[in-house]
């Protein structure tokens, strides 16, 4: 749900130019995330290419959070697919081609598990010299939301995350300590639903579904996790942070991710 909002936000921000999007298995399987990404692009009236990515983590079994996002990954909301055929090129190849066509300029935003990015960095070792930066939603300075130690995106594929953080590409991490502050409450998405356009209506439906689950665990709103790295690219002045070395635990069953 917040992935869909992040795409709509990126499309709406005049500071950003979208080159392409990719899908990866995460909270929902690739069989949902790939067509859903195409549906959102179609909804906003754009024609950005959407590339299929990894169906599972590099070394581990996938994790699915169906309760939060519904069986179809969009809270049960049905949207039409675009009439154009799906892109056949794998996400990791498309990423490399895009970076190679504009060396030092491409800013990559990652809002899911880092499997696609890690595969691309491994397959194309020079990719790390071609990317301008990676801005990602993942991790947390303190605590997690999947285990006491880990946030979902990193926990889902810690091996991929370790590859990305060790790559040397300048990386900005928007962790839970940041994203949990970016919260929409019921009055917010009800107001958006009243805007009278397709995107506002979708936001109201998506967060209505998420709220039916989240409200039962004591939270006061729905965190906009994936919008944070998108907003950071357009308005970095809204954020503060610090430099840190990051190591991803890939072995311990207690602190994985």
Q: Which residues make up each language-model segment?
A:
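Active-site histidine-anchored catalytic micro-motif
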Residues: 1-39, 72, 77-181, 186
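Conformational coupling and interaction surfaces
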Residues: 6-12, 17-18, 155-159, 174-257
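Acidic/polar N-terminal loop/beta-strand segments that form early-domain functional surfaces
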Residues: 23-26, 53-55, 249-251
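A glycine-rich helix N-cap at a beta->alpha junction
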Residues: 40, 44-51
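Short secondary-structure junction motifs
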Residues: 45-47, 103, 243
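A residue-level signal for conserved active-site and pocket-lining positions in enzyme catalytic cores
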Residues: 50, 164, 230
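Surface-exposed loop and adjacent secondary-structure segments within mature catalytic domains
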Residues: 51-79
């Amino acid at each position: 749900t917040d992935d869909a909002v992040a795409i709509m936000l990126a499309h709406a921000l005049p500071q950003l130019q979208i080159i392409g999007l990719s899908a990866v298995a995460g909270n929902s399987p690739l069989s949902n995330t790939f067509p859903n990404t195409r549906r959102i692009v179609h909804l906003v009236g754009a024609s950005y290419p959407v590339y299929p990515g990894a169906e599972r983590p590099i070394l581990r079994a996938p994790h699915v959070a169906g309760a939060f996002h519904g069986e179809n990954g969009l809270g049960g909301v049905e949207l039409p697919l675009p009439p154009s055929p799906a892109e056949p090129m794998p996400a990791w190849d498309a990423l490399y081609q895009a970076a190679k066509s504009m060396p030092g300029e491409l800013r990559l935003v990652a809002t899911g598990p880092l499997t696609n990015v890690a595969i691309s960095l491994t397959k194309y070792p020079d990719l790390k010299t071609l990317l301008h930066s990676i801005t990602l939603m993942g991790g947390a300075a303190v605590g997690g939301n999947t285990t006491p130690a880990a946030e979902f995106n990193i926990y889902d594929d810690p091996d991929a995350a370790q590859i990305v953080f060790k790559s040397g590409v300048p990386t900005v991490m928007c962790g839970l300590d940041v994203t949990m502050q970016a919260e929409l409450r019921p009055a917010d998405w009800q107001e958006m639903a009243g805007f009278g356009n397709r995107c506002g209506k979708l936001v109201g439906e998506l967060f209505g579904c998420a709220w039916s689950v989240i409200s039962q665990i004591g939270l006061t709103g729905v965190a906009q996790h994936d919008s944070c790295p998108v907003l950071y690219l357009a308005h970095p002045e809204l954020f503060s942070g610090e430099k840190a070395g990051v190591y991803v635990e890939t072995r311990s069953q207690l602190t994985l991710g």
